[in-house]
């Protein structure tokens, strides 16, 4: 017999449904549920007296007959594909189905079969997102991995060998020997990884050697000499071997200006790191290249968003990261040339327009590895407060803005680096690298993180208590982060050439190797919800930035959400 219940009661039991609105953390960002794939009156929920019981919501279907390994019930999915409610079925470490879960023998419309072999994760009242992808990592310290994972990042790509001075400044792992040692080390952590080799060379042989040795991308960094010759050589090798090239251009304009770099690139695909310039690049106008169709522009998180503290902290940060000396006037001038309030303010707006497409960390080298997700949403909130609703919004909500910003650390870096067939969104067939969030803690502290469908960390209380919720509750590693589960739950991304050469066997790696693909010939048009191509001009004297003739400026934030109130203990 059908019955009606108040929306508040329904949301308390089964989570919000179509038309309901949810605030993200303590921001001004409000999302609205666009659609609901569950069926009213046939929702599944686990617990005493609830639906997922033998003969009710749980069928007799075996795993061999198609029952799921795990079902996440009534989750509010926040993804570039939309903001909607659904059950999510996981099988063999991948997203098998998105829709309606239950027992097809007793319920209508079931496309996710729950059987005796199915585990249940309660998604009602929770937000489900794809795991984050940080594509700008300096592998300085292995402890970064914990900070990233517990913030909701499940894939890290970058370079380095530890706290060597080359790594403190540049995201490059130089040479196949170092690449091999790093892949062997990263085999042990519950995280997906990719290694970027050093791309600074004017002849191709050494670059080919690194790509065949396991690098899945190449990095051009000014501290190693990002000359027009090195740029051209690296891109030529990348085009031949299908890996991405990331670039940190010449701040001092020694080997040329931004126009010379653009000429050396010759319209080829390139991922431009910290395209605003505070993290490094042609001063003062590297930001112009975010309007080029072949450039995939990203930010690093210290300038996200522009606040009253941004400029002051950057000078000391830069001196340390690039091995500079405050007693040398030229070093101080170098540092000061990179830090410009006008371009940092413009960067906020260019992100909101969708002209900057990716956000990453620059871990321990002018970036905070555990704050990619927080700072993305702080930027979105600041822009909502300062610019109001986006013109693209179709309702009284921030769905379009939220979809645009989540794409910046999920699908877009995955597209840029040739791994979007594996990660970056909640879509059938992709790896079940997922984050479950309490809406009040969205973007700050994930409730649970899964790698290939296995829980690797979660909020957990006192483990000597009689129940799992007593204080202190904090994020702790779970079973998926231990033993041989690690090698089954995470992968290493390598070049196609390295996989064909069986480097996994040569190096004794136990994680699966996945070849990157489709990194060349793509452009800004391929970056989802972040494909704007404004014509950018920078005044060389005042550093004012204009997009299609319009001055881009905004005030620095004095207070941010998702900050101190979440980190009192």
Swiss-Prot record:
PROSITE patterns: UREASE_1, UREASE_2, UREASE_3
EC number in record: 3.5.1.5
PTM statement from Swiss-Prot or TrEMBL: Carboxylation allows a single lysine to coordinate two nickel ions.
Domain Urease: 131-569
Matching Gene3D superfamilies: Metal-dependent hydrolases, Urease, subunit C, domain 1
Transmembrane feature ranges: none
GO biological process terms held by the UniProt record: urea catabolic process
Binding site for Ni(2+) 2: 219, 248, 274
Names of the cofactor(s): Ni cation
Pathway: Nitrogen metabolism; urea degradation; CO(2) and NH(3) from urea (urease route): step 1/1
Coiled-coil annotated spans: none
Primary localisation category: cytoplasm
Amino-acid positions noted as binding Ni(2+) 1 in the UniProt annotation, renumbered to this chain: 136, 138, 219, 362
Enzyme kind, highest EC tier: hydrolase
Pfam families from the UniProt entry: Amidohydro_1, Urease_alpha
Keywords tagged on the record: Cytoplasm, Hydrolase, Metal-binding, Nickel
Location in or out of the cell: Cytoplasm
This protein's GO CC annotations: cytoplasm
Catalytic activity: urea + 2 H2O + H(+) = hydrogencarbonate + 2 NH4(+)
Subunit architecture: Heterotrimer of UreA (gamma), UreB (beta) and UreC (alpha) subunits. Three heterotrimers associate to form the active enzyme.
Protein family: Belongs to the metallo-dependent hydrolases superfamily. Urease alpha subunit family.
Protein name, as recorded: Urease subunit alpha
């Amino acid at each position: 017999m059908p019955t009606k219940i108040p929306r508040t009661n329904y949301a308390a039991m089964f989570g919000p449904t179509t038309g309901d609105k949810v605030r993200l953390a303590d921001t001004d960002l409000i999302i609205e549920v666009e659609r609901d794939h569950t069926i009213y009156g046939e929702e599944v929920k686990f617990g005493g007296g609830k639906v997922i019981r033998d003969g009710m919501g749980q069928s007799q279907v075996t795993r061999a007959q198609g029952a799921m390994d795990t079902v996440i019930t009534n989750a509010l999915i926040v993804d570039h594909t939309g903001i909607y409610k659904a059950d999510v079925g996981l099988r063999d470490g991948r997203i098998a189905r998105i829709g309606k879960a239950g027992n097809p023998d007793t319920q209508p419309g079931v496309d996710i079969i729950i059987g005796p072999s199915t585990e249940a994760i309660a998604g009602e009242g929770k937000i489900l997102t794809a795991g984050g992808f940080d594509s700008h990592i300096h592998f300085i310290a292995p402890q970064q991995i914990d900070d990233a994972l517990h913030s909701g990042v499940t894939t890290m790509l970058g370079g380095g060998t530890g706290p060597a001075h080359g790594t403190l400044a540049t995201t490059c792992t130089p040479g196949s020997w170092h690449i091999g040692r790093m892949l062997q080390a990263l085999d042990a952590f519950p995280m997906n990884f990719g290694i970027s080799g050093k791309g600074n060379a004017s002849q191709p042989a050494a670059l080919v050697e690194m790509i065949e040795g396991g690098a899945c991308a190449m990095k051009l960094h000014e501290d190693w000499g990002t000359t027009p010759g090195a740029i051209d050589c690296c891109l030529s090798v990348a085009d031949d071997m299908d890996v991405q090239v990331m670039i940190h251009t010449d701040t001092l304009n020694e080997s040329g200006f931004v126009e010379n770099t653009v000429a050396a690139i010759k319209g080829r695909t390139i991922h431009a790191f910290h395209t605003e310039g505070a993290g490094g690049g042609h001063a003062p106008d590297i930001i112009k290249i975010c309007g080029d169709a072949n450039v995939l522009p990203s930010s690093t998180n210290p300038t996200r968003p522009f606040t009253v503290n941004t400029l002051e902290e950057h000078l000391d940060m830069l001196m340390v990261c690039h091995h500079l000396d405050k007693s040398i006037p030229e070093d101080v001038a170098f540092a000061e040339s990179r830090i410009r309030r006008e371009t940092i303010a413009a960067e906020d707006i260019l992100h909101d327009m969708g002209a900057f497409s990716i956000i990453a960390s620059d871990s321990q080298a002018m970036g905070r590895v555990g704050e990619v997700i927080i700072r993305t949403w702080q930027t979105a909130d600041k822009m909502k407060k300062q610019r109001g609703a986006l013109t693209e919004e179709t309702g009284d909500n921030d769905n379009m803005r939220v979809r645009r910003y989540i794409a910046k650390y999920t699908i877009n870096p995955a597209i840029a680096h040739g791994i979007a067939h594996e990660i970056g969104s909640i879509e059938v067939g992709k790896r079940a690298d997922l984050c479950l969030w309490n809406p009040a803690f969205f973007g700050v502290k994930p409730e649970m993180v899964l790698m290939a469908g296995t829980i690797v960390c979660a909020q957990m209380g006192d483990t000597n208590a009689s129940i799992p919720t007593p204080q202190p509750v904090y994020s702790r590693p779970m079973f998926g982060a231990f033993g041989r589960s690690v090698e089954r739950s995470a992968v290493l991304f390598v070049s196609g050439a390295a996989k064909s050469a069986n480097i996994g066997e040569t190096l004794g790696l136990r994680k699966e190797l996945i070849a990157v693909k489709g990194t060349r010939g793509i452009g800004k048009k391929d970056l989802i919800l972040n494909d704007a191509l404004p014509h950018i001009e920078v005044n060389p004297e005042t550093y004012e930035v204009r997009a299609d003739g319009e001055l881009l400026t905004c005030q620095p934030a004095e207070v941010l959400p998702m900050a101190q109130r979440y980190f009192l203990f």
